[in-house]
Amino acid sequence: MLIPRRVKHRKQHHPKRSGAAKGGTTVTFGEWGIQALTPAYVTNRQIEAARIAMTRYIKRGGKVWINIYPDRPITKKPAETRMGSGKGSPEWWVANVKPGRVLFELSGVTEDVAREALRLAIHKLPLKARIIRREGGE
């Protein structure tokens, strides 16, 4: 699972989810990609579940790129704890995904295999997304 090795600050403010993605909006490495249409926090478990769904479907063929990284900690206070006494401890890590961001890329497989693998991965993610193809000459 994707977790930062070390961070400057253990606890952070929640990132803003509004606005469109500034970079990473085109397919760069592979031939096919998943592009987010709505904003969301994608956890490290969801990224791993989508990756496993894709790689199991394409079996040994093709290559997968993960273009997002969960670098923001989300904290949580224990159950039945009174309010106050500081912020809770970090529980999981999220990637702040904005609309237009390409999350995963895939190449080295046929079109129907790529579309089905990416469709399976989209179902594991907490956002609306679409499958896009690389533009320009291959």
Curated annotation (Swiss-Prot):
GO terms for cellular component: cytosolic large ribosomal subunit. Pfam families: Ribosomal_L16 (PF00252). Keywords: Ribonucleoprotein, Ribosomal protein, RNA-binding, rRNA-binding, tRNA-binding. Residues 1-19 have a biased composition (Basic residues). GO terms for molecular function: rRNA binding; structural constituent of ribosome; tRNA binding. Residues 1-24 are annotated as: Disordered. The keyword tRNA-binding applies. It comes from the Bacteria. GO terms for biological process: translation. Part of the 50S ribosomal subunit. HAMAP family: Ribosomal_uL16. Belongs to the universal ribosomal protein uL16 family. Binds 23S rRNA and is also seen to make contacts with the A and possibly P site tRNAs. This is Large ribosomal subunit protein uL16. The gene is rplP.
